Structures are given as structure tokens and as C-alpha cells.
From Swiss-Prot:
Signal peptide: none annotated. One of its GO terms (cellular component) is photosystem I. Disulfide bonds: none annotated. Keywords: Chloroplast, Membrane, Photosynthesis, Photosystem I, Plastid, Thylakoid, Transmembrane, Transmembrane helix. InterPro entries: PSI_PsaI, PSI_PsaI_sf. The gene is psaI. It is found in: Plastid, Chloroplast thylakoid membrane. This is Photosystem I reaction center subunit VIII. The lineage of its organism: Eukaryota, Viridiplantae, Streptophyta, Embryophyta, Tracheophyta.
Length: 37
């Protein structure tokens, strides 16, 4: 019961960290591709 009520508290920081990480990785890969070609 407590896990269901605590899910938003776990997901909010997780999403806040995962989305910028994915954005940085995709951006760095895009920059590397542009530098190579």
C-alpha cells in the first residue's frame, strides 16, 4: 500500500534525471556525427 503512494515521489526525480541524460547523450552523438562528416 505504501509503495503505490510513494511511486510518484520515486518517478518524479527519476524522470527529471533520465530525460536530461537522454537529451545530452543524443545531442553529443549528433555533434560527434557532424564532426566526423
Amino acid at each position: 500500500m505504501t509503495t503505490i503512494s510513494n511511486l510518484p515521489a520515486i518517478f518524479v526525480p527519476l524522470v527529471g534525471l533520465v530525460f536530461p541524460a537522454i537529451a545530452m547523450v543524443s545531442l553529443s552523438l549528433h555533434v560527434q556525427k557532424n564532426k566526423i562528416f
